[in-house]
A protein has these predicted regions:
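Flexible glycine/serine/alanine-rich "lid" or loop that lines and gates the nucleotide-sugar donor pocket
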Residues: 27
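Non-catalytic cell-wall polysaccharide-engagement segments
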Residues: 1-21, 31-36, 44, 48-73, ...
C-alpha cells in the first residue's frame, strides 16, 4: 500500500486512533503491507505479494496450528473470533485497521485503569506494549514501544507528483 493513502484510510476505518499513532504502529507492524504475515516464534521465507497468496499462506499456517498475525495492524489469529474477523476479512485493510483500533483502545483503557492517574503518554506507551504482547512489560523489553515512538517522530516523506 502506498503510505500516502494511509491517512485517509486510517481516518475512515480507525478514527479513534490518532493519525500519527496509527501511522507509526502500522509502519512498525507491517511497513504498510496489507498482505503481511508475522509468525510468532518463526518467520516466512518471504512475505506474500498478493491477497490470494496471503490467504493461502494464512490458511496453511492456521491449519498447521501456528500462532500468527496478519495485515496492516498485524492482528493476531487468536483475536479473530472475538473481533468478528475471519482469515479473509482480516486482510481487508479497513477491517484490519478497525480491529487495530479495538485492540489498542482496549489496551489503552486497561493501561489508564492500571496506573492511577497515569499521564496519557504513559498510558499510550503501555497500550502499545499491550498491543504487541498482551501485557504492559514485554513491549518495552523487546523494544517495540521504542520502535513505534521513533516511527511516530519520523516525518513522512512527500512523494513527488507526476507531471501531467
Amino acid at each position: 500500500m502506498d503510505a500516502s493513502v494511509f491517512p485517509a484510510l486510517a481516518l475512515a476505518c480507525a478514527p479513534q486512533v490518532h493519525a500519527d499513532t496509527a501511522r507509526a504502529l502500522v509502519r512498525v507492524e507491517s511497513a504498510f503491507n496489507p498482505w503481511a504475515i508475522g509468525v510468532v516464534g518463526g518467520a516466512l521465507l518471504r512475505q506474500p505479494q498478493t491477497r490470494a497468496e496471503a490467504l493461502a499462506t494464512a490458511k496453511a499456517l492456521r491449519d498447521a496450528g501456528w500462532n500468527f498475525s496478519v495485515g496492516l495492524g498485524q492482528i493476531n489469529v487468536g483475536n479473530f473470533e472475538r473481533l468478528g474477523l475471519t482469515v479473509e476479512s482480516a486482510f481487508e485493510p479497513c477491517a484490519n485497521l478497525a480491529a487495530m483500533q479495538t485492540v489498542l483502545a482496549e489496551c489503552f483503557d486497561r493501561a489508564s485503569g492500571a496506573v492511577s492517574k497515569a499521564a496519557d503518554q504513559v498510558a499510550v506507551r503501555q497500550a502499545l506494549s499491550c498491543y504487541y504482547s498482551g501485557n504492559f512489560a514485554t513491549g518495552f523489553r523487546h523494544g517495540y514501544v521504542r520502535k513505534v515512538a521513533v516511527a511516530a517522530r519520523a516525518v513522512p516523506t512527500a512523494q513527488p507528483k507526476e507531471k501531467v
